Amino acid sequence: MYRNSSRLSSFITQHHFFRIFFVVVKQIGHEFNNTIFRDRSNTLASIIMRKSIGSAVRRRRALCDFLFSSSSPSKKKTSSYSTSSHQNIDSLREDFRYASATLRRYDYETYLCTNAIDANKRAGPLALRALNCETAGITTATVSEKEIALVKLKWWHEHAESMLTPRTTTTTTTTGEKTKTTTAKPLPEHPIARCVNAVATHAKEVLGSEMNEARYVRWIKRAIEARMEDVDKGSSLFDSTADLETFARETHGNFLLVTLDCENIRSMASDHVASHLGTAIGLTNSLRGAKINARNRKTYFPMDLLAAENVSAETVYEGQIGDERIKNATHKIASAAVGHLAAARRNFAENNLGEKYPHMAKLLLQATTTERWLEKLEKYDFDVFRDELQRTPPLLTQGRVFVQAWKNQF
């Protein structure tokens, strides 16, 4: 009798706990949406992403899907995005939907981090991360598709300048009159390319002469060149951990630099933060894809680590679970990623970047998902080929990203 009463009491306690929990989550969700949709009419995202929702079912979808969710029509017709840039707004809206769908399909965690950014700051990170996702997806091609991958990457490399060159620039004459000129460089016929160009055009109108598109082109080209070198070397390994860190910094850190610069965040300290965080993300991604890469007879474990553990690349390609030598090599790469992550946060705190740039932390939310995966890797004793590491619990990830965004931390 006592045991049954105890069970009943426990059930009632749990029942009330879950009822309270879901009520709180629902209320937080409402507050979160209200914050996100406040004053959306004055942003670039308002013109690109305004779309009405016809049913309550669609509003109850995952929290991350608010990017194109409902927003009451604004009375104002103005926007920080200039409609005089000779872009068709309807087609541009479709382009951003395509970019969002690409990010959601191939890099879901980055998609969540992007959606947690304030609406008036979201378009730039979305376009740039979709571009990085697109180029990264090309490099996952097998060795037999090497030439095709190189052609695709070369196409992006050749069009980097036209993508990042604003379509419209405003100049002021000596008489005080403002004139707009349109560049003659052809824009690539690709949705993500048009998104990136729209962001560059908007940044030029906001920042004016402070925007240096040549620097953006240089950063993006370096990232694509690193991808091309990676594809070109095929199954060849990186010589050292330092080479792997350089690759990670080039492919992810450069995109972070452009993202911050587009939001007028530029300083030596912010560059260090972007560099360290990009390196941490790249190192972590090299481990996250270890199992899939092994099937394609490719690995990002550098030669110095494999030699130190007396393990061959063929052993890595087998993808055996529980191999202590591979665990040790994984631990060293993960430790390097943790070190760069800590350095990024330390630079952010020591230089008071949160006070100087209140919106900067949300642009760096990828640190949250990176740290979460590294913690999961440690939980499974750095056994990088475990199937559990390939799964991403969406609710837990959304919750963690939301909390960090709400706290304005990364």
Segments predicted by a language model, with ranges:
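N-terminal mitochondrial targeting presequence
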Residues: M1-I28, F32, I36-D90
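Catalytic cores of Mg2+-dependent Asp-rich isoprenoid enzymes
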Residues: F21, R50-I53, V57, L63-L67, ...
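Intrinsically disordered, low-complexity terminal segments enriched in Ser/Thr
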Residues: T43, T171-T174
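Portal/gating segments that form or line small-molecule/metal binding sites
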Residues: A203-E213
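Residues forming anionic-ligand binding surfaces in small-molecule and nucleic-acid pockets
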Residues: M228-D232
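Conserved phosphate-binding/catalytic loop of the ribokinase/pfkB sugar-kinase fold
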Residues: G234-F238
